[in-house]
């Protein structure tokens, strides 16, 4: 399975073009792209710019990917660096979606921030959590408050392992009690698939299972499930005959574009946007 994982650095189109160029350096000479599909935040932009065959909303792509690993999936928990969402599945279709509405400070990226502040890589910081004896209780509050709690715990002699485990618990508690707003973890479902880059952290996965009492499925491609789902959709919609509408690599190499900044007039905030 080919994958390309990168921050978009504020330009999803430029990053996508970089990924496609990388794909073509690895494609066998007798292979070609016959169907394409975009998903996620830049779905419409990428589809239009590169003339892709399809585009699909992120929730549907996540469902396709989750169902590949568990055909009976009835709940998908997705925790990324900046957002978290819960997708409930009913009768093999997306029934409801809940996500963090404004603040992203309780999402996965704050574990990375804390790890760096303690001079640990994310991977080593996560491993420490697995050997915690007394995880500190950080609750479900904002990162600003957690910072002060962590500093206080350090003053009181808390081990790095206990801090890391406490943060892993906190991410899950934020997802369950602040975003999904459940009172009984049993309401989540019986076939749960967890995904998003944050779940590469074994401590976060274990925290989820301990809090909910449910054994979840975590695919080994947890961080790219949206893209994997889009690939499955493209394969399903291919008729086996038609040529892809996607721009050829030569045309992609020749593609030029410009960006301008303006203010969105969709509401009274008049936010600055790039076009």
Predicted regions span which residues?
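Conserved small/polar residues in nucleotide/adenosyl-binding loops
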Residues: 273-275
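Conserved phosphate-binding catalytic cores of ATP/NTP-utilizing and phosphoryl-transfer enzymes
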Residues: 16-18, 43-80, 85-92, 96, ...
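Conserved phosphate-binding/catalytic loops in two-lobed NTP-binding clefts
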Residues: 53-59, 209-228
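Phosphate/ATP-binding catalytic cores across multiple sugar-kinase/actin-like superfamilies
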Residues: 22, 166-189
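Glycine-rich phosphate-binding/hydrolytic loop that grips phosphoryl groups
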Residues: 64, 111-113, 220-247
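Adenine-nucleotide phosphate-binding core of ATP-dependent small-molecule kinases
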Residues: 148-177
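Glycine-rich phosphate-binding loops at beta-strand->alpha-helix junctions
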Residues: 40-42, 170, 183-211, 222-223
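Glycine-rich phosphate-binding loop plus the immediately following alpha-helix
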Residues: 9-11, 91-134, 223, 232, ...
């Amino acid at each position: 399975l080919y994958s390309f994982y990168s921050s978009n650095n504020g330009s999803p189109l430029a990053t996508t073009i970089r990924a496609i160029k990388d794909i073509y350096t690895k494609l066998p000479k007798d292979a070609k792209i016959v169907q394409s599909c975009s998903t996620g935040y830049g779905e419409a932009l990428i589809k239009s710019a590169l003339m892709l065959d399809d585009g699909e909303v992120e929730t549907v792509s996540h469902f396709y990917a989750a169902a590949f690993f568990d055909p009976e999936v009835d709940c998908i928990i997705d925790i990324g660096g900046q957002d978290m969402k819960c997708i409930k599945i009913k009768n093999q279709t997306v029934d409801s979606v809940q996500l963090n509405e404004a603040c992203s400070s309780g999402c996965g990226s704050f574990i990375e921030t804390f790890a760096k502040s303690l001079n640990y890589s994310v991977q080593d910081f996560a491993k420490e959590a697995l050997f915690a004896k007394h995880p500190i209780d950080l609750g479900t509050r904002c990162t600003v408050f957690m910072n002060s709690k962590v500093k206080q715990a350090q003053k009181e002699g808390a081990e790095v392992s206990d801090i890391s485990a406490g943060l892993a618990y906190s991410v899950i508690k934020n997802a369950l009690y602040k975003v999904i707003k459940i009172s009984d973890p049993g309401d989540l479902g019986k076939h749960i698939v967890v995904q998003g880059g944050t779940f590469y952290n074994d401590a976060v996965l274990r925290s989820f299972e301990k809090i909910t009492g449910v054994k979840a499925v975590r695919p080994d491609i947890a961080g790219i499930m949206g893209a994997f789902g889009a690939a499955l959709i493209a394969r399903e919609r291919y008729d086996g005959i038609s040529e892809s509408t996607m721009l050829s690599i030569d045309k992609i190499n020749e593609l030029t574009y410009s960006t301008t900044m303006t203010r969105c007039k969709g509401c009274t905030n008049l936010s600055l946007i790039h076009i």
